[in-house]
Design a protein with these regions (language model features):
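Conserved beta-strand segments of alpha/beta enzyme cores
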Residues: 109, 270-272, 371
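Inter-motif core of Ras-like GTPase G domains
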Residues: 287-311
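C-terminal-of-GTPase-core extension/linker across diverse P-loop GTPases
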Residues: 2-9, 13, 143-265, 282, ...
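Switch I (G2) and immediately adjacent beta-strands of P-loop GTPase domains
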Residues: 55-65, 70-74, 254-282, 303
Length: 472
């Protein structure tokens, strides 16, 4: 337990129904009682029971300010694991500020950003992954991001990491005991058994990393870049997906000369739509800068949409730029034929079916694994299918229901463990010796423990919790 008592306003500034001021520390109860009185008699107020909401009069310097609700949480049954008090005043910046000043006057210290959550971690109420998930919940910009952060807060990530960590410890123990065996005695684990266990660890960790990658995309928002040659309808598609006019649309090539980014929620997922300048050779310096930004955006995109004009056959330049696009990465790329409403039509069972250059052998011969979809940004044809395709590419290595909202630092530690396990597998296969394998196992275990904060430096903790708001 920490010796001092901290206080802060936990609710946002401004007018509202209520404002909440919270305290944590050994003197929370005695400090709160100094500014509270019984509502009718105005006699001295005393907390009697923990976890019971009490009506009290708030007094500062013998002057009544407000009637408040006061609740006391006795250690260790509180968020921080310490004695805590919450005072619920009427909403308003001034009354909350004066209430906080009264607590500080009687011995509380103003809390630092994230200090309540930090104390919960230091008092073993939550581990570091759960502490970071609190920030994920606060900053969630979509329903799925919120759900994935809640899964981490509930301990799902911690449990999966501990399962892998415990398996590593078991293997590590068997190997290190074997190092003490006299030469000639049978080891506790042979190479075949070790390889089998390491492969199982790699599989479990890969599945966990896939869920965490999905969670990272949910947390940060997936970048979906709309690219293509000039005048294929990139800005029209952006406007259609947003269901509002955000980008200027004209028949003049090169209208879009800069990156235009807008957010949209698709199936509960936060998606950043990025409209780019049409790719072509140009002598215009401003347009050329926009084209360079478009290429950079494509390289960093989570999903790449390459638009083509369905109303005409592709020419040599279309094919050339399409091939350059396909050279980037097919895993998250889609060829989108826009303007299908202007394509010729045939009848199939009485229904009009657009016939576009996506059926052209020139396109298909570039790569047999192309994802191709026909749409019309103008009429809305197939936009729902395009959205579904985007979501499927975003969560291709996992599912929305298993995504775990983690930070990039946490993901780095999991990948470090993955690299260690790959090195262990190689070491076992070439029989390099148990000492090296034991060291690699230890490194893998430490990476997992850093995610949970089992061994964390003060510098790391300060870096994490300083990102929280005051009062959290």
């Amino acid at each position: 337990m920490l010796a001092d008592t901290i206080a802060a306003i936990s609710t946002a500034q401004g007018e509202a129904g209520i404002a909440i001021i919270r305290m944590s520390g050994p003197a929370s109860v005695s400090i709160a009682e100094k500014i509270l009185r019984l509502p009718k008699s105005l006699n001295k107020f005393k907390f009697i029971n923990s976890r019971v909401m009490n009506l009290a009069a708030l007094y500062l310097d013998d002057a009544p300010l407000d009637y408040v609700l006061a609740v006391y949480f006795k250690s260790p049954l509180s968020f921080t694991g310490e004695d805590m008090v919450e005072l619920h005043t009427h909403g308003g910046s001034l009354i909350a500020k004066l209430c906080l000043e009264g607590l500080l006057k009687h011995g509380a210290r103003l809390a630092e950003p994230g200090e309540f959550t930090k104390r919960a971690f230091l008092n073993n109420k939550i581990d570091l992954s759960q502490a970071e998930s609190v920030l994920g919940i606060i900053k969630a910009r979509s329903e799925e991001a919120l759900k994935s952060a809640a899964r981490v807060l509930s301990g799902e990530l911690s449990n999966k990491i501990l399962e892998i960590r415990d398996e590593i410890l078991n293997i590590q123990g068997s190997i290190e005991i074997g190092l003490d065996f006299p030469e000639g005695e049978e080891p506790l684990i042979n190479n075949l058994e070790l390889l089998e266990q390491v492969n199982k660890l790699i599989l479990n960790l890969n599945n966990l990393i896939a869920d965490c990658k999905t969670g990272c995309l949910l947390r940060e928002g997936a970048g979906v870049v709309i690219a293509g040659r000039p005048n294929v309808g990139k800005s029209s598609l952006l406007n259609a997906l947003l269901n509002k006019k955000r980008a200027i649309v004209t028949d003049i090539p090169g209208t879009t000369r800069d990156i235009i980014e807008e957010a949209i929620i698709i199936e509960g997922v936060y998606v950043r739509l990025i409209d780019t300048a049409g790719l072509r050779e140009t002598d215009n310096i401003i347009e050329a800068d926009g084209i360079n930004l478009a290429r950079e955006a494509l390289n960093n995109a989570d999903v790449k949409l390459w638009l083509m004009d369905a109303s005409r056959e592709p020419d040599a330049q279309d094919i050339l730029y399409l091939q350059k696009f396909l050279d980037l990465n097919l895993d998250n790329s889609v060829i989108v034929f826009n303007k299908s409403d202007l394509a010729s039509h045939t009848l199939d069972d009485g229904a009009g079916t657009p016939v576009s250059p996506s059926d052209n052998n020139i396109i298909n011969n570039l790569n047999k694994n192309l994802r191709i979809i026909n749409i019309s940004a103008k009429t809305g044809y197939n936009l729902g299918e395009l959205k579904n395709l985007i979501i499927n590419l975003i969560v291709k290595d996992g599912s929305l229901n298993s995504g775990l909202n983690v930070s990039s630092k946490q993901l780095e530690e999991l990948k470090a463990c993955e690299n260690n396990l790959a090195e262990i597998k190689e070491a076992v296969e070439i029989n390099v010796g148990e000492v090296i394998i034991a060291d690699l196992l230890n490194s893998a275990r430490l990476s997992l423990e850093r995610v949970l904060g089992i061994e964390s430096s003060e510098v790391l903790l300060n870096s994490i919790f300083s990102r929280f708001c005051v009062g959290k």
